[in-house]
Amino acid sequence: MKKIFKIATLALMMPAMATFVSCDDAFEPAIENIKDGVEDFVMYPSWVEAYIAHAYISNPLDELSFNDMATDDAVSNEPGNSYRSMATGSWSASNNPMDRWRDLRGSIVYLNGALELIPQSPWASIESTQEMFVERFSGEVYGLRALFMLHLLKNHAGMANGQLLGVPIVLDPETPKSEFNLPRNTFKECYDQLIKDADKAIEMLTEEAVDLKDNEAHLIPAKWAAKGVEVGEYNRVWGAHIVNRMNARVAKAIKAQ
């Protein structure tokens, strides 16, 4: 009898206990979890940097292309080889082993969005450090955009009606209301935009990422030294921890191609 009484008591207490331990946002997200528009988004610099990180992940130089089998130079013995399937009738818009458009064009979308968000995001409390972060991240974006434009032209430029065409040039962030049915710009226009972006990257970025020693303040570029930037803050932005990111030397190599 006592056991039955205990069970009944627990059954009556459970709903009351649930009211004390349940989350008030179990069914409606808490306000702080809802990011409404650019104003909320830019307050989280790591989220803004994720736009740039997406482009680094899609880096067209990060993988080897074994496309010899897409020509008569080689043939695969593997039945499921994508190039072999392509040659035997499986090539379509939804199954294209040669596709580079999606990743290259998609990364430019992210880079354009980053350019809008970078100046609005609080990267540092010190004004000069904030300026350095904005310049570095913007320079990376311009350099990456030049790189992706280069590979878009390599893969998708061509002749049409006797004219050498490139790809549509899109420099602004896109929304669901943007015009996506854009004509291709000429190859020359795309080339000029590539050079323009590469030049901006060269202007904004350093040749290489190195940590300055405490007695090397004289190596801080005059632009930042004039703003009172010290070695510690300079290394925070331009130090060796960013060695694998876009720099002026890489931008020059892109421009040279």
Residue ranges and their predicted role:
Residues 81-158, 176-192, 199-206:
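Conserved, well-structured interaction surfaces
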